[in-house]
Amino acid sequence: MTRTPPSETLSRRTLLRWGAAGGTGLALSPLAACAGPTGAPGPGTLTLGLNRSLVSLDNKLNQFDAAVTVQRAVRQALTAIGPGMKPTPVLADRFEMTAPTTWSVRLREGIRYSDGRPVTVEDVATAVRMYGEVAGSFILGLFPELPSVEATGERTFRLHTRKPVPVLDRLMANVLITPAKDNRPEELRSGVGTGPYRVVSANSGAGEYTLARVPDYWGRRPPVERVRVLFVPEESSRVVALRSGELDVIDTITPDSAEQLTGLPGVHLEKTSGVRICQLFYNFRKPKTHPLSDPRVRQALTYAIDGESLVRDVLTDSAEQAEGVVPLSLQGAERTGRFVHDPGRARQLLKSLGADDLKIRIMWESGEFAADTSVMEAVAEMLKDVGVRTSLLQFEPGGDILKWRQGKGGDWDVIGNGFPGPTGQAVTMLQAMYAGTAEDERTGDAFMGYVNPAIARQISDAATETDTAARDRKLAAAQHAVWDTWPCMWAFVPKTLLARRTRVEGIGLLPVNSYDLTAVRLEG
């Protein structure tokens, strides 16, 4: 459904305050098909209320931040990114670079899937191949190249790459292992994993799952017997359900909701810095004659956005304006510049470039980031102030926005998009967003159509550098080059915030907005 800005004139301050309160006329009603939680959790059941629909417990296409918590409870990888954003062993007990293009890996002894089948080297080889074959894979874009798998024993194998991939131990944390005969180049809706929980019921269309503890799990026995996962898109409903005890944990909440929950008996807030960047990213598939194909026009539009007001009044200081093309908390990130609010300059530049009668379509998926609708409504008003007409297109979770991102669903100009930093390394995020090639774009897999061969070469060169200091220097140059192309109208880095009932203990919230369910316990 397309929504357009309100016709009456509002001051920017009024709109920002109105948007922060969730009262703008553009706000879409919650999905009627998505029911809220019913009844309090049992004494041995942990109930999670997610802000986005978890359509699969596989991650080939679907890995938003909070989903990782649930997906890794069922399926696991060779490694995981743990505290301090460092790689830790999971299914592998050895993962070593033994040559610039070779890693030696050994599977843990005795690891089995929840149905009793042993994990094999063939399962790993098949998993790597399936991630490479799936269309539109988010994970594939993180890799400079996928490794090949050479079995050297019953539990041992080597990972080979054509060029060095010095962060391969981090990247492989995103490849979840499934029995080879069950794996396919698609998002799996069923099947078993090696994790501490198995699926006992699932309604992927509604984003609802019930997980039960695996009795003979190979690792540490999780204290919680059952986990119930619900999709509750409306934040107010999630807050009410948490307060009443119907939900135990809710993720990705706004500061307004956090303020409501602060100090309430039985409720506790968890907060940490984040490694996700949220962007108003331009569509780089526009014809060369389109105004947005001109980086000067893209830059001019950035002056229309009052980022400080958005952070202060809509996001209520739960985020920081981006000062680089990736979050500065990532290893190798470079401060490249700042977004400046100057509407007079925006109007002047747009007029001088013949783009003073511009109309743009902004799209996003509900739940992409906290207060997303309010941010978009405020942005529409700011653009109106410099003479740019807008239409807003909001997708509900589970829709076909992926096709639009790939240029296969319809035309758009700007997308509200959140991109995670799942390895803690700037090079991974840069690889996924800005190292796309013409070959990638033939299948729609270049990020929003961004193809710049010179920048792709810079990033690829940095990605193969084994010396950390040298890699960071190369990455810094690449990041400045990206910034100068003006890929975003605006960007910010949100803080990670969730709320839990005090009966829930042991949540070690990571900057990637996930936590290890095996450490969670229920008190009382």
Regions found by a protein language model. Name each.
Residues E96, L140-K181:
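Surface-exposed binding/hinge segments that line
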Residues K86, R170-P222, R226, G344, ...:
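Gly/Pro-rich hinge or "lid" segments in bacterial periplasmic/extracellular proteins
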Residues L498-G524:
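Long beta-strand-rich cores associated with HINT superfamily self-processing modules
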Residues L292-E381, D385, G449-V451, A477:
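Append "and occasionally in soluble cytosolic enzymes with long acidic Gly/Pro-rich linkers
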Residues P185, P215-Q260:
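Ligand-site clamp/hinge motif
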Residues L50-A99, R129, V192-T194:
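N-terminal lobe/hinge region of extracytoplasmic solute-binding protein
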Residues R389-D400, Q431-R501, G524:
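Extracytoplasmic/peripheral linker and loop segments enriched in polar/acidic and small residues
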Residues L48-G49, M382-A438, D445, K474:
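Periplasmic binding protein-like
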